[in-house]
Design a protein with these regions (language model features):
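Acetyl-CoA-dependent GNAT
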Residues: 6, 12-13, 24, 28-34, ...
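Conserved GNAT acetyl-CoA-binding A-motif
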Residues: 139-150
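Terminal substrate-recognition subdomain of acyl/acetyltransferases
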Residues: 2-19, 179-193
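Conserved active-site alpha-helix within GNAT-family acetyltransferase domains
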Residues: 131-132, 150-178
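Alpha-helical interaction/dimerization surfaces of two-component signaling modules
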Residues: 40-44, 140, 157, 161
Length: 193
């Protein structure tokens, strides 16, 4: 199994901008999609972690060993009922976004569902497709998500989708070198809609 983290993030042809209708398609991920999806996550964590996560830790948490571990974990999560969605660029059939939600195992979870990952390659941002990916992943479910406390783009995105910043003090992720995290929560959503 190829666990490399090389994902081509070169710019797209000028004749097909990211906002072109029908350029991206959301679909259920299968086990075979997980290596490429994990590589997308590694590229995105590398980007958002610059200047936030210490360089040595960032190299470690986005390297091939962690990508391989992520693939193994995600296979188990998928087998246990986690919802995995990917966004595929129809130009070259590459995975450019990944989202995963699962029933939380945390004893202090404010909602049953947790968005465990939602990552988007830079060339596939700001075209509305992330909205479709989030909707396909959690629909109208109440859910929560942890983001880097200083990631204003992520916080704004989730707030547009009815999430609010949790009043708690947040958390610190020691596995990422002490990065401060903020939890956002969307609750009181009518599940049957």
């Amino acid at each position: 199994m190829d666990t490399s983290v090389n994902v081509d993030t070169s710019s797209r042809p000028a004749h097909e901008p990211a906002t072109a209708p029908g350029r991206f398609v959301v679909r259920d991920a299968c086990h075979e999609d997980l290596p490429e999806a994990a590589a997308v996550q590694a590229v995105c964590v590398r980007e958002i972690g610059q200047g936030v996560i210490p360089n040595d830790v960032l190299t470690e948490v986005t390297g091939p060993g962690i990508v391989h571990t992520t693939i193994e974990q995600w296979n188990h999560f998928m087998d246990d009922g986690a919802i995995f969605k990917i966004l595929v660029d129809r130009l070259d059939m590459r995975t450019v976004r990944v989202a995963m939600a699962r029933v939380s195992t945390s004893s202090d979870a404010p909602t049953p569902w947790e968005i465990a990952t939602l990552h988007v390659l830079p060339e596939a941002r700001n075209c509305g497709a992330s909205d479709n990916l989030l909707d396909a992943c959690i629909g109208n479910r109440s859910a929560y998500v942890w983001v880097f406390a200083d990631n204003a783009r992520a916080i704004s995105f989730y707030q547009r989708h009815g999430f609010h910043v949790d009043a708690s003090d947040g958390a610190v992720d020691d596995s990422l070198g002490g990065v401060e995290l903020q939890r956002l929560i969307r609750e009181d959503i009518i599940e049957s809609q």
